[in-house]
Amino acid sequence: MVSPVTVVKSEGPKLVPFFKATCVYFVLWLPSSSPSWVSALIKCLPIFCLWLFLLAHGLGFLLTHPSATRIFVGLVFSAIGDAFLIWQDQGYFVHGMLMFAVTHMLYASAFGMRPLGLRTGLLMVILSGLCYAFLYPNLTGAFTYVVGVYVAIIGFMGWRAMAGLQLVGAAWRWTELAAGTGALLFIVSDLTIALDKFCFPVPYSRALIMSTYYAAQMLIALSAVESREPVEDYRLSKAK
C-alpha cells in the first residue's frame, strides 16, 4: 500500500507544471464570451501537463499498466472536449459532451469491475436518477436524451471509481482514494455545468466548474501511479 504522504513526496515535483498551468488559467481568466484558439490552449494546458505527468513515468509504465493507459487516453479525449466547449455557444456543446462521455467510459474501464460494490452502484443509480429528474423539465429536443445518456455514463464511472472505497483501514489504498475523490469532483463539476446551462445561473459557476474539474483530473491521473489490484486480494491476504 502506498500512503498519500509517500505519493505527495514522490509525485509532487512531477505535478509542478500542472499547478503552474492551472494558475495561469485562473490568473489570465480569459473571457468565455470571446472564444479563440489561445483561450482553448490556456484551458487545455493543465490537461497537457497531466499527459506529461503520466509520460514522465515512462512508456514502459503505460504499456505494462492498462489502467494507466486508459486514463492517459481519457485525458486526451478530455482535452479535445475542453476545446469543443470553448465554442459551446457556437454549437459545439454536444461535441464536448461526446468527448467527455468517451473519457468517462475509459476511466470506468480503468477502474475495473472488481470489487463489484452493488450498494455503491445502487446509490449511484438513485443519485443519477434524481439528478436527471431535476434536469428533465428544463431539457428540450435532443438534450432530453443526450443528457440522460451522459448522466448514466458519468454515474457508472462514479460507481466504478468509488466501489473500492467500501472497505476500511489497510484496504483503503491511495489508488481508490484518489479515484473516488476525483470522480466525485468530476460529477460536481459536470452537474454545475448542467444546472448553469439548463436550469438557472449558478453564482461563480465558471470558478466552481474549473476548480473541481482540474482537481478531479489531477486525482484521477494520480490514481494511475499505483497499479490497481482487486480489493478481493486484501481479503485473501487477511484470511491467510
Curated annotation (Swiss-Prot):
Its EC number is 3.3.2.2. The chain crosses the membrane at residues 22-42, 44-64, 71-91, 93-113, 116-136, 139-159, 175-195, 207-227. It comes from Bos taurus. Belongs to the TMEM86 family. PANTHER family: GH04784P, LYSOPLASMALOGENASE-LIKE PROTEIN TMEM86A. Keywords: Endoplasmic reticulum, Hydrolase, Lipid metabolism, Membrane, Transmembrane, Transmembrane helix. Residues 1-21, 65-70, 114-115, 160-174, 228-240 are cytoplasmic. The keyword Cell cycle does not apply. GO terms for biological process: lipid metabolic process. GO terms for molecular function: alkenylglycerophosphocholine hydrolase activity; hydrolase activity. This is Lysoplasmalogenase TMEM86A. It catalyses: a 1-O-(1Z-alkenyl)-sn-glycero-3-phosphocholine + H2O = a 2,3-saturated aldehyde + sn-glycerol 3-phosphocholine; a 1-O-(1Z-alkenyl)-sn-glycero-3-phosphoethanolamine + H2O = a 2,3-saturated aldehyde + sn-glycero-3-phosphoethanolamine. It is found in: Endoplasmic reticulum membrane. It is a multi-pass membrane protein. Catalyzes the hydrolysis of the vinyl ether bond of choline or ethanolamine lysoplasmalogens, forming fatty aldehyde and glycerophosphocholine or glycerophosphoethanolamine, respectively and is specific for the sn-2-deacylated (lyso) form of plasmalogen. Plays an important role in lysoplasmalogen metabolism in the adipocyte tissue and macrophages. Residues 43, 92, 137-138, 196-206 are extracellular.
